[in-house]
Design a protein with these regions (language model features):
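Hydrophobic alpha-helical transmembrane segments of multi-pass integral membrane proteins
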Residues: 1-247
Length: 247
């Protein structure tokens, strides 16, 4: 409410989208406190990724121009496509709204694939060696690719392969959301502190560990359930054996 009041007083229409995202996050948080379910957590991740889609535009412009400057192309200017930014945020918002309303799985699946395609379109603007030579650009690209892969898996899961649903959600929550928050905060922190834009070793290690954790959790989601079920079955067998032995 305070942020919305400041935006209204400053008459800055460019921040209205962030106010909407903050409102949605607050709504999801209140709903989860009243009814803690996995579906609400999934909507919170989707809304956070909408915020990522909006913030990425400014972050991408900063790292793109820095990459050109570091590569000796300071006369060039990098400007991300604002239309793909808006389209990706709108389609993801539509998917989150449709999923919250309990639409049929095929509808959600096609919208998830549309979301993946919209974010994949944003990757095209980075397909230049002048940009990809910079390590922070490669990190940004890798996390964005994880987001595309996550919604692709989610769409496939909701169109008929439900075994991919849990891996997709783990990939989105860890390798997309958490990793992108790390990238954005590290880049924004250096820029606002007046420091040179560098991809420090500790940040690289943190990002690598998050990506590895997300991918391993994605690949091992079903395996972990099988191991858990096996352990539970073995415990039950042991209890039955000892009960028969004692009595």
């Amino acid at each position: 409410a305070y942020t919305a009041l400041r935006v209204i007083r400053n008459r800055n229409s460019r921040l209205i989208s962030f106010i909407l995202v903050l409102t949605l996050l607050t709504t999801c948080a209140v709903a989860y406190s009243l009814r803690p379910t996995g579906d609400i957590l999934h909507r919170m991740v989707d809304v956070m990724l909408i915020a990522v889609a909006l913030v990425n535009f400014r972050v991408g412009r900063a790292i793109g121009n820095q990459a050109l400057e570091d590569g000796g192309h300071s006369t060039l200017t990098f400007l991300p496509n604002p239309y793909t930014k808006n389209i990706s945020a709108l389609i993801l918002g539509l998917y989150a709204a449709v999923a919250a309303c309990g639409a049929a799985e095929p509808i959600q699946g096609w919208l998830a694939l549309a979301t993946a395609a919209a974010f994949a379109a944003r990757l095209q603007e980075w397909h230049s060696l002048m940009l990809l030579r910079a390590p922070y650009v490669r990190a940004h690209y890798a996390v964005s690719l994880a987001l595309v892969a996550g919604y692709t898996l989610l769409g496939v899961a909701q169109l008929g392969l439900p075994a991919f649903f849990s891996p997709a959600r783990h990939l989105l929550a860890i390798s997309a959301m958490l990793a992108m928050v790390l990238v954005i905060m590290s880049i924004a922190g250096m820029r606002h502190s007046g420091l040179n834009l560098r991809f420090y070793p500790d940040t690289r290690l943190a990002l690598a560990l998050i990506l590895i954790g997300g991918i391993s959790r994605c690949l091992g989601a079903d395996l972990a359930l099988e191991i858990y079920d096996y352990i539970e079955s073995q415990n039950l067998s042991c209890h039955l054996y000892f009960d028969d032995t004692i009595y």
